[in-house]
Structure formats: C-alpha cells, structure tokens
Amino acid sequence: MKTKIPDAVLAAEVSRRGLVKTTAIGGLAMASSALTLPFSRIAHAVDSAIPTKSDEKVIWSACTVNCGSRCPLRMHVVDGEIKYVETDNTGDDNYDGLHQVRACLRGRSMRRRVYNPDRLKYPMKRVGARGEGKFERISWEEAYDIIATNMQRLIKEYGNESIYLNYGTGTLGGTMTRSWPPGNTLVARLMNCCGGYLNHYGDYSSAQIAEGLNYTYGGWADGNSPSDIENSKLVVLFGNNPGETRMSGGGVTYYLEQARQKSNARMIIIDPRYTDTGAGREDEWIPIRPGTDAALVNGLAYVMITENLVDQAFLDKYCVGYDEKTLPASAPKNGHYKAYILGEGPDGVAKTPEWASQITGVPADKIIKLAREIGSTKPAFISQGWDPQRHANGEIATRAISMLAILTGNVGINGGNSGAREGSYSLPFVRMPTLENPIQTSISMFMWTDAIERGPEMTALRDGVRGKDKLDVPIKMIWNYAGNCLVNQHSEINRTHEILQDDKKCELIVVIDCHMTSSAKYADILLPDCTASEQMDFALDASCGNMSYVIFNDQVIKPRFECKTIYEMTSELAKRLGVEQQFTEGRTQEEWMRHLYAQSREAIPELPTFEEFRKQGIFKKRDPQGHHVAYKAFREDPQANPLTTPSGKIEIYSQALADIAATWELPEGDVIDPLPIYTPGFESYQDPLNKQYPLQLTGFHYKSRVHSTYGNVDVLKAACRQEMWINPLDAQKRGINNGDKVRIFNDRGEVHIEAKVTPRMMPGVVALGEGAWYDPDAKRVDKGGCINVLTTQRPSPLAKGNPSHTNLVQVEKV
C-alpha cells in the first residue's frame, strides 16, 4: 500500500540556525551537508504510519561497529520481522547524569543492513579468479571440510606462522562476536587450540599515535575526558572531529558542547577541512596543509620560548630533554628541544613563525597570536584526533602536537589534557577468553601484503617484524573475519589485487561476513555471518566520556537464510580439527554469556541479574571520580606514580628513539628522531612529485558510514553523497563546477567521482571520505569513490603504519 505523506510534513519549515545547531550536537549530522529535509520527514512519516500490532515485541539490540561508540537499538518486531528501530529511552539529555545513549543515523538504519540485498545467504566457494566475485553454493559441511583440510595441510607444510588473522573491525563492540584485535577473537581462540598464528600489531585507526606517544608518555597516551572541558578556558583541536567521528553513543561531541556551555571556553580547530565539529560553534578555524602540524607546533614553541610563555617549573620537574638541565648524558650537546627550536641544534635553523608559515600555509601573524593565546590561557584542553598521525611522518607529528600541552604544563590537571585524544571511563566487563598464542611473531597490520609477497625477506630492523629477527615463511592462509581491509580499507588496491589474484602465493582466503563486500569477492571460501540482530551478545562502550555502559544485545530475529554465528562456525571447525572440547569447554554461546556475566558481576557488583539485565537492556555507571584526568597521579607525585617510560618521566628527548634511529634500516626520506622535530616525509607538499601531482589528497571519516560499514545502505548514500571536496580556487583553475564528474589520479590508480566545490577545503588540498565501496570498471578505474585506489602501501617509519592521508594527486574534469 502506498503511504501518503501529509503535505504539512513536507511544508514544515526548519530555521537555518536551528538546523545547524542540531546537526552535530545530536548526532543527526546528515542534515547539514546536502541532505534534503523532506528525506528525514518522509522517513519519520513512514515510521509513524506503521501500524502497531498486539503481538509487536520490542527487543534490545545494539550497533557494534567501529565508530568509537556503541549504541543500544530497540527493535520493534512483528511476526519475526524488524519493522522499525528506536534507540535508548532511559535517562535524559543531561550529561551530568545517566544520560541517554542515542544512536545516530547509521545505527537507526540497522534494519536496512539486516535486510540488505547484499546479504550473504549460504556458504560458497570461488569458481572464477579472485576478485571476480564468481562463486558456487556449497553446504556448510563441505565448507568446513575444505577449510579444515587445507589449513592442516598448510600448517604441516609451512608451519603456523603461515596462517594470518587479518585486521577486521566490523563487529568491534561485541563480547563473543568481537572481531578485533585478532588475539581477542573466536578465530584466534580456534587457532590457539591448533598451534597459533601470525599476529599483527597496530591498527589502521591509530598506529602512528600509539607508537609515537608511547615514547613520550609510555604506553597508550591517555587523555582527559571531554566532560572535563567544563574546567577549561581554551580548547584547541588538531585534526579532531568528534562532530562526525564521535557523533553518537557515548556522545563525545555532545559532552564537548555541554562542557563548553559551562566553561565558555574558546574553541580553535586546526584542520585542512572545515568539519562538522565547527559548524558555526568554533571560535576560529585555522586551515593547514596536511602533514605539517609539527611545523606549526615548532613555530608556536618558538614564540612561547622566546616570550617566556612556557611552564619552566613543570618542564624541570616532570620532563626529560627540554633543555640542557634535563638532557640525558647519552645525548649530544645541544641535542635538547629548546636548542632545536631556537636554531642552536644540528640543523641550525630557528623555527620562527615565518619559517613555519612557509611550510604550513598558516600566516605568521596568526601563528604568533595563537602561540600567545595558548601560552597565556590555562587550563587549556589541547588534543589531537587521529587525522594528523595517519601520515608518512605521523609518529613524530603526534609527539610534536603533545608538546603544546607539555610546554604549558597542562598535563595532569583539570581542564587540561596531554595533547592526545580525549579519554573516557570504562567498566571491567569480562570478554570471551581466547587462550595464549604459541606463536610470538607479529608484523604490522599494514604489511601483510608484503608478508605474502616477500615474507622470508622481512626483518625486524627493516620491516618491523617483532618476536624474532625475521619471518621464516610467507603468509599462506588468511582468515578475514568481519573486516574489509583485505581490499577496500587497505591502501593501494591495485597492488593488493595483483598480489591476491595469484593463488599460488596466498593459497587460502576464508572470509566471514554478512555482506558481499569488496573483500568478500576475493575469498576462496565465503561464510555467511549473522548480524548483531540475529544473535545474543553483550556490547561494550568505547569513547564515552565519564559514563560507561554495557548493552544487552539480544537476539531479535532468527538468523536469515543459512547464516550462522561465528561461535557456531568456529565450534564446528574445532570439531573437525580435533580440539572441540578445548575450544568450547562444553558451553553453548548463551552458556558462555551467562558464565562471562557471572564473572563480570564479581567485578561490577551493581550489575543486575542476567534476566533483569536482559529486560533492562542497558547498564550505565558514571565515573566515581567525576571527570577523568589523564596522568593526575603522576602530576601529584611523580616519584610514587612514575610513567612507564624508561625515565619514569615525560620524555621530550627519547634515548630509545635515538637507539632505533641508529640501528634500523630506513628508506631514503624516512626519519626517526629522538626529538619531536618536523620532517616532511614522502609525498609531502614539498616533494618534487608535486610538479606532476600538485594537490594533496587527504581522507576523513564520513558520517554516513563507519569506515565501509553501512556503505551499502541506500538511504544513507542518498543523504550523504560520496564527493571529492575541493576549494573554489583549485576548481576554477581546472574548469570544475560543483557536481561535475572529475577524475582523481596518480601513479597508483584513478577514481571518478562528483566534485563538491566548497570553501570548507584549504586551497591545494582535496579530500575524500574514506570507506566508500570500491567499484572498478574493466580498466580498474573506480567509480565508487574509494580513496584507497590512490593511497600508498609504503609504511610510516616507526609504526610501519598506514599513511592514508599522505597522497599527491591531480584532478581533471571528465
């Protein structure tokens, strides 16, 4: 029956101010950029027109994707079918209490993922070349037998180090269904029962910042909770865009807004793109060339040092290597940070605002003004998102940005921050144990294609192999569970295609997924997984400010088609591999959940009973300390609470990095340095390649997708079109108008997509939202707007991570 939309709904007016205000704050950010308003009104009207039946059930479920949030979904089910989706209805919008955990446009469209035409229906095996997407249907028994037989053969011939668990975050929030890190998955538990597997370290989101700030603070760098901004006088965000990357669930973007309303803190955004985090709520946007954040910081530091705006007492007491007083004896003369900034170090170049301006594109007078504001305003919440670190010089850039918080003594205090991304409170909920991996070898998550191509050549000193001096064998089998990094989310797709097409190299690829993704098309055996709506699990929060929560993700509907849960699949494989008892310990999936929940109640006594929690749907608890303050104990007593760095202090100069720089084998242009210096890295604005490819291409997390997840949902694609963002000045030079089809290209590939001509991009820079589904034609020209056709597989120097935002391209009108 056709639903008639009331004219009054379509005629309703929304003020520009009201629309902009709503955009990023409430997680409905799709409205602000090219979403036609009748779209949302029609959707609402259609939902309202759905009749309520007496047998309707409302069942708690969750969206468990890798967006930094985990959201409860209240599924309305009639006759075994999901009719519509609502979100959390417990609590209110006051972030001082147990507030609602509201799903965004993505989670609310979960029904369209469950019933998507792309759903995998039954097990299949490849019959064409890898990547062609040609498969034939097989039984589950045949699929299990093929996998078990071939895996045993490969282990016997090459050893367990030849079996690799690929990076996948499609169901990150689950307890039983968790897909990352690989060591915490049910596939890992299965492999650990069978002798282990080749592990990976790092991740595509934060490899460089995790490695870089490890040498500054020791371990993962913590940050203050966003709620603590209510104590701040100034907020400075480097490439941090919670308005899109943290727009739902724990609501980091809403914490930011409510906290600023209390503190009236000025907010300055430093980013090549004017993001939804701004959207009229920022006080200043400073556009900057990608990959030059460290140069900007150095220029700021020059002003702070020469105008006596640094916190000398803090630097003397808590830090190593700021000046001669705290420089390690092993360091060279004038090897300290102050000497480097003032031009008294080995390069002899003073890092003046004028010097920084030439590199960054930020005017020198603006650098001076910003330095004085940061140096004279305290406390200041200085943070960086994960955009600046996803570069060829990402590790060293993260250390540089953190220097602003260190120089001003904003670390370990209310209203301040460490210079890292915001932190949050978490609950000690128990997840599925996965046993110990007997294989100690690991590689960077970004270098698995190299491990297929030249595994035995990869060494610790040249390629970052950990656990041994070198790899002994290449990767011969890949498990790809709930991930699209086999193709779509991995850099330089055309190179990956060439490597994977040769099935004599990697002999077996098993893909477990819900949809026919780009990666699924490269499977040898393809297994259909259940969605979160088709099984029972617990979902845990991620970035959630100072209120943590757990969601009871109940089974909403029966598994569709022949889909099975990951626990069913791995249990059946364990049976064929002779390790069933060790793997299952005699428990079903629900029995494991009850077992884990009982353990969690011991750690969190406030949790209700299992059955009460099932009805309740969500458990929330606020941080008993109020706001989370990173390194507070260290600040209060550094001797009693040292950091995990070698010195126990904040290491501005890192002797460990000096040792690595002296011993590792690096390609020309790669730099590892004991100080947070500026180094351009490859394919920078200053690279000679700029003459051929004059535009810098950067990526961003688009609000309609979580990486590639939800990238096949029609209404989200219509609401938030995939476009290449380009400044009017660059567009005019090329005769490009808004909406024109353009070709973006370099030596690695070519993408055809529409142009979005907007002053929200810095001149000389273009941007593509990452995660769009790869859609090549016969000549391998991508028509889907997938940025990884253009990115490089050359890793960053220290973390060996993905430099996804370091790209030079040319753009032409088609």
Regions found by a protein language model. Give the residues of each.
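Phosphate/diphosphate-binding loops
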Residues: 507-508, 555-574
